[in-house]
Amino acid sequence: MSFISNPNIHFYLLAYFIGGIPFGYLLSRFFYNINLQEVGSGSIGATNVLRALKERDPKKAKMMAALTMLLDALKGALVILVAKMAGMSVETQWAIAVLAVVGHCFSPYLKLEGGKGVATGLGVMAVMLPLEAAIGLVVWLVVGKTLKISSLSSLLGLGALLISSFLIHPEIPEIGTHAPLLIIAFVIFYKHIPNLVRLFQGKEGRVV
């Protein structure tokens, strides 16, 4: 089978380019003429959407942030679901999951800049490891509600998802390794390094 006609390659490209769609950037630009890369943390995710819009349109800021999060999660989940319906192997589905998150974090439409990967990561995990994704989501919600620090709640939720995955599945079904999950976790952690620096300096902003 040639490179061009290989359906796996088609899905890998689809995952990266759909994962790279910067919904937060597009929504803020289209409705408010705000360039998310020039405000707040410069990220294109829901948290920065909320921060950027709070002063401009406080009544709709949370709604736009929630919409951004939903779209970012769906773009990761939908590509995998289509791959499942097309009969792609579990190995291919995991590769798609990784590439969707990489696409979001290093978007081809924004000169390889992007978001933190949390919502897209949650979307792909909801399909691949739904129980672990639910555990991570609960931790993220509880910590976020209590401490109101988005980066910390995201990383603790990620940690909970990782730990629970090893406890529930010592070997990930059908692939026998946690490697794709660890790659996704590494990418998300890497994108949060500036947040961790600010956190240790006491400069990380809270989200109200």
Swiss-Prot record:
One of its GO terms (biological process) is phospholipid biosynthetic process. NCBIfam families: glycerol-3-phosphate 1-O-acyltransferase PlsY. Pathway: Lipid metabolism; phospholipid metabolism. This is Glycerol-3-phosphate acyltransferase. The chain crosses the membrane at residues 7-27, 63-83, 86-106, 123-143, 149-169, 170-190. It catalyses: an acyl phosphate + sn-glycerol 3-phosphate = a 1-acyl-sn-glycero-3-phosphate + phosphate. Catalyzes the transfer of an acyl group from acyl-phosphate (acyl-PO(4)) to glycerol-3-phosphate (G3P) to form lysophosphatidic acid (LPA). This enzyme utilizes acyl-phosphate as fatty acyl donor, but not acyl-CoA or acyl-ACP. Its EC number is 2.3.1.275. It comes from the Bacteria.
